[in-house]
Amino acid sequence: MVKILGVIPARYASSRFPGKPLVKIGDKTMIEWTYRNASRSTALSELVVATDDTRIHEVVQGFGGNSVMTRADHISGTDRIIEVANLFSEYSIIINIQGDEPGIEPELIDGVAGLKASHPEWKMSTAAVPLIDFSHGEDPNRVKVIIDRNGKAIYFSRSLIPSQFKQTVPLYRHLGIYGYDRDFLLKYNSLPKSNLEESESLEQLRAIEAGYGIGVYLAQEAGLSVDTPADLEVVIEDFKKRKWIT
């Protein structure tokens, strides 16, 4: 049986929203909401928060979650995931779950994990949703992905892809969740940085340009993420509608 580890990277020192993981949504912190919703996934064998901040570490331990302290000098979230993968050698698949999506649906995690487990020829998996609002296609903060007939990513871009010259194919928005083969993840940083990665500022293009496959799970809808205090207010209203908070 394949053992799958879910990892939630959590930083306190966010430039746009310092202390973001510890902001309250109702009576719980955002990191607790993310952890509890992610823990509903049936695919994960274990779930852990990876942080370089003792405040986050103590909060996670306080609500009964698993947390590990990582180095503070990591350049990216992937670097933090790699450090954790080295600590948990018994897991063959690692799922990188964003810590700023408190309402994450467990089905999304299950889909990404299941796709990776069923396609060992693909070294990574991720997710996307149909891009319904055409105006979002022009937003560079909403990454787009082209997917082939087998469900594998062809390319990721901040630009609108593919061209809508004839509007014959659907548009897909990429979601920031990743599944990795553990062995591939551990050698990821040894892959040469690609020109495409630098141009788009999208780390996953390193794998694409090196010739590795990334499978794409198609989700029904995107969850709400929190990048700014304004985003937090939107999430709070959404949670009230769900009757998760009052």
UniProtKB/Swiss-Prot annotation:
Coiled coil: none annotated. Its EC number is 2.7.7.38. It is an enzyme of class 2 (transferase). The keyword Oxidoreductase does not apply. Gene3D superfamilies: Spore Coat Polysaccharide Biosynthesis Protein SpsA, Chain A. GO terms for cellular component: cytosol. It catalyses: 3-deoxy-alpha-D-manno-oct-2-ulosonate + CTP = CMP-3-deoxy-beta-D-manno-octulosonate + diphosphate. It holds the Pfam family CTP_transf_3. Keywords: Cytoplasm, Lipopolysaccharide biosynthesis, Nucleotidyltransferase, Transferase. Activates KDO (a required 8-carbon sugar) for incorporation into bacterial lipopolysaccharide in Gram-negative bacteria. This is 3-deoxy-manno-octulosonate cytidylyltransferase. It comes from Leptospira borgpetersenii serovar Hardjo-bovis (strain JB197). The lineage of its organism: Bacteria, Pseudomonadati, Spirochaetota, Spirochaetia, Leptospirales.
